[in-house]
Structures are given as structure tokens and as C-alpha cells.
Amino acid sequence: MQASGLILVALFSAVVSYLALLHLSSSSSSCVVVVTGESFRISGCDFTEEFIGFAKTLRVANSQP
């Protein structure tokens, strides 16, 4: 009886840990900027004043200055 209780506690702990890690990984934002020869794509970024200043400097390879 004690062994099955211990297994249940371990299983419950594993599930709670998994759900906590899943929540933490989904709540963190990851900023991705993809620049190709034809366009650029911005995904998942916080648009702060500094980031907007950076984004204004982005140029694709085929664009004219």
C-alpha cells in the first residue's frame, strides 16, 4: 500500500512539474527577425522604442537605399 502511494505522489509531482515547465516555456516571448533577400519578418517581439528604431534600419538585399 505504501509503495503505490509513493508511486502516485511521484507521478503527481512529475505531472505538476511538466505543466509548470510547459507554462513557463509558452509564456516567455521569443523575438525572431528573419531577413531574406526579398523581405523581412518580425515575430513575437515587444515593440519598444529601441526595437522600433532597430526595425527602421532593416533593409533587404534587393532594396535601394
From Swiss-Prot:
<feature type="topological domain" description="Lumenal">
    <location>
        <begin position="1"/>
        <end position="3"/>
    </location>
</feature>
<keyword id="KW-0472">Membrane</keyword>
<comment type="function">
    <text>Plays a role in viral cell-to-cell propagation, by facilitating genome transport to neighboring plant cells through plasmosdesmata. May induce the formation of granular vesicles derived from the Endoplasmic reticulum, which align on actin filaments.</text>
</comment>
<protein>
    <recommendedName>
        <fullName>Movement protein TGBp3</fullName>
    </recommendedName>
</protein>
<feature type="transmembrane region" description="Helical">
    <location>
        <begin position="4"/>
        <end position="24"/>
    </location>
</feature>
<dbReference type="Pfam" id="PF02495">
    <property type="entry name" value="TGBp3"/>
</dbReference>
<feature type="topological domain" description="Cytoplasmic">
    <location>
        <begin position="25"/>
        <end position="65"/>
    </location>
</feature>
<dbReference type="GO" id="GO:0044167">
    <property type="term" value="C:host cell endoplasmic reticulum membrane"/>
</dbReference>
<comment type="similarity">
    <text>Belongs to the Tymovirales TGBp3 protein family.</text>
</comment>
<keyword id="KW-1133">Transmembrane helix</keyword>
<keyword id="KW-1043">Host membrane</keyword>
<keyword id="KW-1038">Host endoplasmic reticulum</keyword>
<keyword id="KW-0916">Viral movement protein</keyword>
<keyword id="KW-0812">Transmembrane</keyword>
<dbReference type="GO" id="GO:0046740">
    <property type="term" value="P:transport of virus in host, cell to cell"/>
</dbReference>
<dbReference type="InterPro" id="IPR003411">
    <property type="entry name" value="TGBp3"/>
</dbReference>
<keyword id="KW-0813">Transport</keyword>
<dbReference type="GO" id="GO:0016020">
    <property type="term" value="C:membrane"/>
</dbReference>
